[in-house]
Every structure is written in structure tokens, then in C-alpha cells.
């Protein structure tokens, strides 16, 4: 698994993975205030992550070409099985400043091509427009994908996370 995280550093992401897999409170893990029963879960989570082939790249403003180059190398050297990108709008297209929607379209098409070329699924996270905050029904729809209709065109599957309890407290 290759994770290209332009939002979080590799160490922040590793802490989150340990916290999640070990079912340990993230704040206690981050501050080192672990309780006795946390230690075995942290150790198990670290062991499991160590045995998992997971590569975290936290290069900021990654371009599609650089990402493609890194993914090809990982596929060749480690038989890459999944690519995760956090998140699409933080990628950059060098020299293209026409408009952001055009850039996002180019990035989206590039990721679709990469998935086909390497025969590897690509999960690309995306931000949503703030417009859904003003609607009565806060459930996200495809039109809420930020800066491009190309995302819905290029994606094989689009999934949204929605927590009713968050909006209806």
C-alpha cells in the first residue's frame, strides 16, 4: 500500500495508524500518557504495521508525474497493491495555472490512467464544497465534489462519509 499524504506528515499518519489499529486513544498516544493496558495494544499495532508493506510519502504539493514515477517504482520493487491519495486538491500541476478546475481535471485523468497502467486501485480523497453546509439535507452528493465535475466522470466509484449524529445533535 502506498499512501501519498499531502495533508499530514508521515509521523502523524503513523501515529494515527497505530492509534486506530491498536484501539488506543490518539491523544494519550501522542502525548505519551499511555495507561498500562495500552502498551500491549500499541506494541501489537506497531508489529502489525511493521509486517505490512505500507509506504507513506508526505511530499507536499505532489504533481501527477512525480506521483506516477514513485508509484511505478513501488510497483516494480514491492508489487504495489493499492494507492491512497490524501487529498486530490492538494496536488499540483506544474506550469498549469489556467484555472483550478482544469488542473483538478488533469490530475483526475492522470490518476485514472495510473490505475489502468499499473493495474492497481487508486483511492483519491477529495474535499467537498461548503455549499452543502447551507442545505437542509447535509448528505453529500456528487455535485459537492470540490473544483471539478471531472472527478465524478473519471471515478469508477464515489463514496461519501456522512454522520447523521454530527449534523443532527
Language-model segments: residues:
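Glycine-rich anion/phosphate-binding loops
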Residues: 65, 101-102
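Cytosolic-facing regulatory segments adjacent to core modules
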Residues: 1-79, 93
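A generic structural signal for short
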Residues: 59, 99-100, 137
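Phosphate-binding/switch region of NTP-binding enzymes
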Residues: 103-169
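Conserved ATPase-coupling elements of RecA-like P-loop NTPase cores
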Residues: 92-99
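Conserved nucleotide-binding/hydrolysis micro-motifs of P-loop NTPases
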Residues: 8-11, 20, 60-63, 88-91, ...
Amino acid at each position: 500500500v502506498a499512501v501519498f499524504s499531502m495533508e499530514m506528515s508521515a509521523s502523524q499518519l503513523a501515529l494515527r495508524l497505530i492509534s486506530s489499529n491498536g484501539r488506543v486513544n490518539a491523544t494519550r498516544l501522542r502525548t505519551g500518557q499511555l495507561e498500562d493496558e495500552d502498551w500491549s495494544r500499541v506494541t501489537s499495532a506497531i508489529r502489525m504495521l511493521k509486517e505490512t508493506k505500507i509506504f507513506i510519502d508526505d511530499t507536499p504539493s505532489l504533481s501527477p508525474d512525480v506521483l506516477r514515477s514513485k508509484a511505478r517504482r513501488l510497483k516494480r520493487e514491492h508489487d504495489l497493491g493499492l494507492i491512497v491519495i490524501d487529498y486530490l486538491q492538494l496536488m499540483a500541476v506544474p506550469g498549469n495555472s489556467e484555472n483550478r478546475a482544469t488542473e483538478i481535471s488533469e490530475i483526475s485523468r492522470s490518476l485514472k490512467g495510473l490505475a489502468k497502467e499499473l493495474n492497481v486501485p487508486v483511492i483519491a480523497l477529495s474535499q467537498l464544497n461548503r455549499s452543502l453546509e447551507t442545505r437542509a439535507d447535509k448528505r453529500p452528493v456528487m455535485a459537492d465534489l470540490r473544483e471539478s465535475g471531472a472527478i465524478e466522470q473519471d471515478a469508477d466509484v464515489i463514496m461519501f462519509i456522512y454522520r447523521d449524529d454530527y449534523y443532527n445533535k
